[in-house]
Amino acid sequence: MTDIRDPELPGLLLRTERDALIPLLRARPDDDFALRTACPGWTVRHVLAHCSAALIRVVEGRVEAGGFTPEENDRDIAERADLSHQQIVDELERGMTEAGPVIAAAAHRWYDGIALGEWVHAGDVREALGVPGAYEGEGLAPALALLAGLTRVRKAQPLLARLDGHDAPLVLGADSPEPAVYTGSAATLIRLVAGRPLTGTRYELSGAREADLLFFG
């Protein structure tokens, strides 16, 4: 299967998520930023600081080879220790607004994965805040399109995803005459590939194990 990159898709995803997430964050009390998330050791504030730092590094051309290591992530979060919660939200809004054109201009898909990861982290924040539909919303369609392209390029586990409410299946991973088959909601698929909690979900998976679908964590 051939796959043509849509360079505008990451920016669309980031702007769509910006318009949903930023107003939500501005309306939350300070105590909510101390809530724990699905990311081990990280609160809502930690996740937001990581996301804003990652996007600003993209905008300013400061992404080093090898990506975002745990040490770099910890450093980015520590550097924002003196910022207020809303200052971090301000920086995140800037990153979600300005990173799209930079990602579109890149001659590779690596930055596309950053945009998708930001959207997943936004879901982590929503879930910690108790907002329904954590990994759903207006950004789900572009997120699925990005996921499909990235998994094919990186030759991930072949998977035919039969998603609830979708007429056509979503094809993920390397070309294969016998892909694994997933049947369930798109939001649960996101949880599977991102290694997020599956408590209370329903789905069917044949031809692969849950661990085989983990694309990023």
Name these PLM-found stretches.
Residues T43-V44, S84, S185:
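Short, structural beta-strand-to-alpha-helix junction motif
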Residues T16, A20, E91-R94:
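A non-catalytic, amphipathic alpha-helix used as a structural packing/dimerization or gating element
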Residues M1-L9, V63-P70, A104-G217:
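Structured surface interface patches that mediate subunit assembly and partner/cofactor docking
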